[in-house]
């Protein structure tokens, strides 16, 4: 708990269940604090280690913070925009509101009504910005490049997880469900692995309630193909960077995605990426002389098979894309860069 009188930015989280938005807050706020930003969170479902304020502390929003004309309220959902509008416009509190939009779909009339009343809007990708009818600043997500980094020894990284160090591995990480394209990944591996005995595949992630049958069907499909010992379903892990470090190629097979951090996490670990053209993937993965991977059409199994094979069968290309991905994430996608860009938006409102 921190004294709201020492807080200039409030980051609300009004959703109890863990989501991508909540995860963004959890990862960003400590970095923002480390960079000197006077930010605190508000709401449930967040680690107690984060600096926070209480709802009853909001009474202090009538007073300006020292040296500033107002505070900033950084909303990421409709349910967080509405109370801020009421505090600012109805109660006349000293507040400016920022909204970050990650949605790649047409906004409802209600969402548009709220967004038009923001003092500043951030879009998490160029595609997201295209769905906004108001001026906005594009700030791509970043990742913790200290947490996601290559192994000192890939052989040892594989051994530590009980994997065969003599094999190369293709991975697909995230929730196991149709929307995430897990079935496309599995089917592509069923097509590719039989004639590539030196490769294996890893599916890391959890299937929840309605998706358990989907996962079971995929495992049955793998077993029928005689690949149960080569396409591994390892479940959900908290040490996911260790699993990236054991990979040689990563596939992001999503049919739909809001942003999608997994390609960045893979590239930061020195792993080339094959990704579908959804979310922000086409803005993260690059081709040409600085190739970090390949972008393919969504829901296209043949394209996925061909793209994965292009790396699996070309070791020099695989190695070059690995080095390029590492350089690209380090230069352009460190989470500190995201935090500084967001701070510039805050500053523009608190001058």
UniProtKB/Swiss-Prot annotation:
Class of this enzyme: transferase
Pathway: Bacterial outer membrane biogenesis; LPS core biosynthesis
Top-rank taxon, per record: Bacteria
Keyword Transcription regulation in annotation: no
GO term, biological process aspect, one: lipopolysaccharide core region biosynthetic process
Example of a GO MF term: glycosyltransferase activity
Keywords: Glycosyltransferase, Lipopolysaccharide biosynthesis, Transferase
Family annotation (Gene3D superfamilies): Glycogen Phosphorylase B
E.C. number: 2.4.-.-
Family: Belongs to the glycosyltransferase group 1 family. Glycosyltransferase 4 subfamily.
Role played: Acts at transfer of mannose group to a 3-deoxy-D-mono octulonic acid (KDO) via an alpha-1,5 linkage.
Protein name: Lipopolysaccharide core biosynthesis mannosyltransferase LpsB
Originating species: Rhizobium meliloti (strain 1021)
Gene name of this polypeptide: lpsB
């Amino acid at each position: 708990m921190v004294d709201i009188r020492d807080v200039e930015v409030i980051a609300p989280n009004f959703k109890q269940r863990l989501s991508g938005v909540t995860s963004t807050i959890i990862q960003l706020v400590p970095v923002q604090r480390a960079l000197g930003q006077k930010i605190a969170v508000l709401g449930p479902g967040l680690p107690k280690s984060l600096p926070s304020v209480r709802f009853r502390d909001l009474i202090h929003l009538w007073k300006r913070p020292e040296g500033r004309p107002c505070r900033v309220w950084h909303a990421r959902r409709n349910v967080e925009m509405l109370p801020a509008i009421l505090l600012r416009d109805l109660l006349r509190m000293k507040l400016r509101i920022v909204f970050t939009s990650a949605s790649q779909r047409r906004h409802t009339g209600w969402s548009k009504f709220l967004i038009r009343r923001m003092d500043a809007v951030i879009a998490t990708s160029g595609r997201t910005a295209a769905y906004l009818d108001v001026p906005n600043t594009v700030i791509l997500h970043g990742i913790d490049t200290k947490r996601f980094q290559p192994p000192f020894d890939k052989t040892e990284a594989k051994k530590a997880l009980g994997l065969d160090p003599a094999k190369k591995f293709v991975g697909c990480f995230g929730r196991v469900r149709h929307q995430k394209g897990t079935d496309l990944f599995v089917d592509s591996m069923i097509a590719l692995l039989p004639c590539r005995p030196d490769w294996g595949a890893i599916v890391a992630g959890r299937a929840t309630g309605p998706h358990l049958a989907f996962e079971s069907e995929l495992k049955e499909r793998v077993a029928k193909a005689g690949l149960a010992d080569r396409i591994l379903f390892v479940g959900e892990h908290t040490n996911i960077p260790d699993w990236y470090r054991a990979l040689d190629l990563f596939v992001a097979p999503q049919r739909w995605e809001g942003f999608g951090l997994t390609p960045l996490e893979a590239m930061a670990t020195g792993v080339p990426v094959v990704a579908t053209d959804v979310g922000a993937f086409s803005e993260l993965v690059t081709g040409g002389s600085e190739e970090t991977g390949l972008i393919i059409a969504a829901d296209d199994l043949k394209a996925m098979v061909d793209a994965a094979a292009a790396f699996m069968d070309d070791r020099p290309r695989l190695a070059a894309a690995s080095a390029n991905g590492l350089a690209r994430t380090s230069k352009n996608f460190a989470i500190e860069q995201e935090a500084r860009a967001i701070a510039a938006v805050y500053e523009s409102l608190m001058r």
